[in-house]
Amino acid sequence: MRIEVIKREGNTFEFYLEGEDHTFANLLVETLHEDKHVKFAAYSIDHPILMARKPRFKIVTDGKESPEEALEKAAQRVFDRARAVLEAWKSAIEG
């Protein structure tokens, strides 16, 4: 996974997230939408074959937090949820 910055201007951040597809991209966008300071968050895949694992993201915030801060917070929430699922899974299989 690698972030390639396309544009950073004001409260807008656009970037590619190399190595990911719709599965993670949709999860990240939905998690960004939970942030009250995020006014817009979406992704697209420019070409379904050539760029299938390189979604393009756009995040716009209200200025009370930067798009990068919103991205970091969303990534942490995704990580925390994945950890909770793993712990629940371990508890379930251990009895």
UniProtKB/Swiss-Prot annotation:
UniProt keyword annotation of Metal-binding present: no
GO CC terms of this entry: cytoplasm; DNA-directed RNA polymerase complex
Q: Which GO BP terms, alphabetically?
A: DNA-templated transcription
Q: Does the keyword Transferase apply?
A: yes
Its EC number is 2.7.7.6
**Reactions catalysed:** RNA(n) + a ribonucleoside 5'-triphosphate = RNA(n+1) + diphosphate
CDD domains recorded for this chain?
RNAP_L
What PROSITE patterns does its record include? RNA_POL_L_13KD
Look at the named UniProt entry and state the broad enzyme category this protein falls under.
Answer: transferase
Compartments (UniProt record): Cytoplasm
| Keyword annotations of the record | Cytoplasm, DNA-directed RNA polymerase, Nucleotidyltransferase, Transcription, Transferase
Q: Enumerate the GO terms in the molecular function aspect.
A: DNA binding; DNA-directed RNA polymerase activity; protein dimerization activity
Q: Which domain of life is it from?
A: Archaea
Pfam families associated with the record: RNA_pol_L_2 (PF13656)
Q: What does this protein do?
A: DNA-dependent RNA polymerase (RNAP) catalyzes the transcription of DNA into RNA using the four ribonucleoside triphosphates as substrates.
Check the record and name the PANTHER family matching this protein. Answer: DNA-DIRECTED RNA POLYMERASE I,II,III (PTHR13946), DNA-DIRECTED RNA POLYMERASES I AND III SUBUNIT RPAC2 (PTHR13946:SF28)
Quaternary structure? Part of the RNA polymerase complex.
| Family of this protein | Belongs to the archaeal Rpo11/eukaryotic RPB11/RPC19 RNA polymerase subunit family.
Its recorded name reads DNA-directed RNA polymerase subunit Rpo11
Biological source species? Thermococcus gammatolerans (strain DSM 15229 / JCM 11827 / EJ3)
